[in-house]
Amino acid sequence: MAMKVDLILVLLNSLFNIQACTGQGRIERGKIDVAEHIKKEASVPLDTSINGIILDDTVSLNNILGKRLPVIDFSNYGECTVCSNIDGTEILILCVNYGGYINQYDKFVVVPSHSIIQPKRIRQTLLKKFCSGLGAYIGCDIKEIEKQMMMMNKVQYKTAEGVEIVYSQSLPDWPYHCEYHFMNNRLIRYEFDCRDP
């Protein structure tokens, strides 16, 4: 009889372990569901790609832009690769990940081509526009993407051209930072990076 009770207890314990590992069964009161906890803690989705090119990922970049991209030393950005869209109206600056692999970049900046001094070596792409993973693109209306930015820090500046609104976010436990600059409710610049401070 004692052996049957022990066997039943072992089987019940195994069943509870299987349910815990597969996520089946009820969550007891007072215990934390990790997936739900992460969803609650992340204030906004993170923007980490432009046209499928992912921060710090060499494979996605090689598939979209090619294996060897020219690296230049460009103004305030350091070593980077500068790309333009097909008609040359937008510039994508890919900043080199120091200590990383070839074609590994840890900062992306997108600006209109008229807003910066153009470097001599620009890689022209076949992309019509540079669009981020969350739908941001140069010239988009603030209303198109403000839902993703509701929990970000917001700062307004008065300039000669009008009011500039900057949404930004930094994560305390991960080296990630993003900024979206709007002038007259239109996106004029955006950038994100995953660099250690």
Regions found by a protein language model. Name each.
Residues 179:
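Conserved catalytic or metal-liganding residues and their short signature motifs at active sites
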Residues 165-166:
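Conserved phosphate-binding/catalytic loops and adjacent sensor/switch elements of nucleotide-binding enzymes
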Residues 1-28:
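Bacterial Sec-dependent N-terminal signal peptides
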Residues 22-161, 171-174, 182-197:
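Short helix/turn-capping signatures at newly exposed starts of structured segments
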